[in-house]
A protein has these predicted regions:
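Primarily a LysM-type cell-wall glycan-binding module
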Residues: 452-490, 495-510
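Membrane-lipid interaction segments
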Residues: 2-460
Length: 510
């Protein structure tokens, strides 16, 4: 006989696809006429970006591009650069139809190599790694109670974070940044660096208010024979994202990434290029969760008949911390040459790892520091060196398994010259992350009692004397003898289910 089970709905995020894809970057191109011939290549830099995502049944298509910047010097030892856009489209086949699912895709350059075939022709080879996650909010039924006085149930409540939804919004930023009066007019742009960081997220009913900043640095060649100069700016933004069902008691894990970045010099009223035009497209993504206590049954048995119990394992996730912080890294770097002048220093995050230890989340990784400089003979030189960083963040320890996928961006980078062959790098990093606890619980999802198979008992025995062992629980003892938990507590005059080692119990069997 199938028992009358009271069931309730539990909402979870189900990962339909979670894997890495690889996109090759293979191209050869010729420099345009306005670019001088290559004498020496300093650096080939590649920045991949996902521009758009689409889902069609069991297929996901990602469209994007890789911005490849070639930094080199010509025969007259002048700094030069050329930017090449490599478009791509990547399709992933999913194990089943995923209509209505959410897509999160992050692209990172695994490696990039370039070779000057001639003074004007360049061959590039590389690969972009894309982390793709396709997930959907699903509903699972669990048993919260059983309506039968002959059934013993073990009721528990589990704190869980119920996923309320996932929302994305694109933000366009258009800004013109004029040069200062002390800076020379722009002849050409050598290199650009940009990053975006979420500073604050506030939840109001059905909406998330996201505040953040975009950081832009531009290295350019001035007109005439001047040394390359730098423009740096910070552009704040604020945006409202609609998320149905969220309240001010919910938590929100919000991240930002740059999808499109176009930086060009602009001609001003003086008929000179004295302004930088910035056109950016930023993707804001928010995963929202609300805390809840979920009633459930972890075990059950019949005191009279044999029963078939079906179980399922459910993994609950809960946000324990949300982080939006900045931290500073200082590292000294020994150079392979004596410097006459440093033109520019920049950093990029190469990799990042997290571990949890003694109530702290430790974020560590590698920064690649690049230096444009001139040596004692005023010859252009490029130097790069990896340096490690580590940052510790306190978090609330829990019983579950914590995990975190932090977003780390370089906010600013500066330097101090210590000696002719040594400099100190000051890097400000912004970290944005949600720390999650994952807890897997085995639950009763169905129960069927076989009334044709009564539990065999010794009819001459109405009570058993049992000595509790070290690992025994009152529930295990009741289950072993198919006895009533309340009757055991009543006969033994117990106020709680706590047992002392070696305690003698009277277990009524009728």
């Amino acid at each position: 006989m199938k028992e009358k089970c009271l069931k309730s709905d539990v909402f979870l995020n189900e990962n339909i696809f979670c894997d890495s894809l690889e996109q090759a970057v293979d191209a050869d191109f010729t420099l345009p006429d306005f670019c001088p011939d290559i004498s020496k290549i300093f650096k080939c830099n590649a920045i991949p970006r996902i521009v758009s995502k689409s889902l069609n049944g069991a297929s996901v298509t990602l469209d994007g591009n890789v911005t490849v910047t070639i930094l080199y010097c010509d025969k007259e030892n002048r700094f030069c650069s050329y930017e090449y856009i490599y478009p791509f489209s990547k399709t992933a086949e999913l194990p089943r139809d995923a209509s209505g699912s959410n897509i999160i895709a992050k692209a990172k350059c695994d490696y990039i190599n370039c070779r000057a075939v001639t003074g004007r022709k360049i061959d590039i080879h590389g690969a972009v790694g894309i982390n793709l996650r396709v997930f959907k909010r699903k509903c699972d039924e669990i048993i919260s109670d059983i309506d039968d006085e002959l059934i013993e149930v073990k009721r528990i409540t589990s704190p869980a974070t119920v996923p309320m939804g996932y929302a994305e919004k694109y933000l366009l930023i258009e800004e013109d940044i004029p040069l200062s009066s002390a800076q020379m007019s722009i002849e050409s742009i050598l290199k650009t660096n940009s990053s975006v960081c979420v500073k604050e997220t506030k939840i109001i009913n059905d909406k998330a208010v996201v505040k953040g900043e975009m950081f832009v640095s531009v290295l350019y060649c001035p007109e005439g024979e001047g040394t390359p100069q730098i423009i740096k700016t910070t552009l704040p933004f604020s945006q409202i994202i609609d998320i149905d069902g969220v309240t001010d008691s919910c938590e929100c894990d919000c991240k930002a990434e740059i999808c499109v970045m176009d930086i060009k010099p602009k001609v001003t009223a003086s008929a000179e290029q004295r302004c930088i035009g910035i056109n950016a497209k930023i993707l804001l993504s928010c995963e929202s969760y609300c805390s809840n206590e979920i009633p459930m049954i972890s075990d059950a048995f019949s005191r009279k008949f044999e029963a078939d119990i079906k179980r399922k394992n459910l993994a609950f996730e809960k946000i324990t911390n949300t982080i939006s912080e900045k931290f500073n890294c200082k590292k000294s770097i020994d150079l392979d040459f004596n410097i006459n002048n440093i033109i520019d220093v920049w950093c990029s995050v190469q990799n990042c790892y997290t571990k949890f230890d003694d109530g702290k989340m430790v974020v560590s990784g590698t920064l690649m520091t690049g230096i444009f400089a001139c040596d004692e003979n005023n010859i252009p030189i490029y130097f790069e060196k990896p340096t490690d960083f580590e940052y510790k963040i306190p978090f609330n320890e829990t019983m579950g398994i914590p995990h975190c996928d932090p977003q780390i961006e370089v906010v600013s980078c500066g330097f101090t010259i210590i000696s002719a062959a040594k400099i100190e790098i000051h890097t400000e990093l912004g970290i944005n992350a949600g720390i999650y606890e994952k807890k897997e619980i085995s639950l009763v999802c169905d129960m069927e009692v076989d009334e044709n198979k009564p539990i065999k008992r010794d009819k001459k025995c109405a009570m058993v004397i049992y000595y509790a062992g070290e690992n025994d629980t009152l529930w295990d003892i009741a289950h072993k003898f198919s006895a009533s938990l309340n009757e055991i507590m009543s006969v033994n005059k117990m106020d709680s289910e706590d047992l002392c080692n070696g305690k003698m119990l009277l277990v009524p069997l009728v």
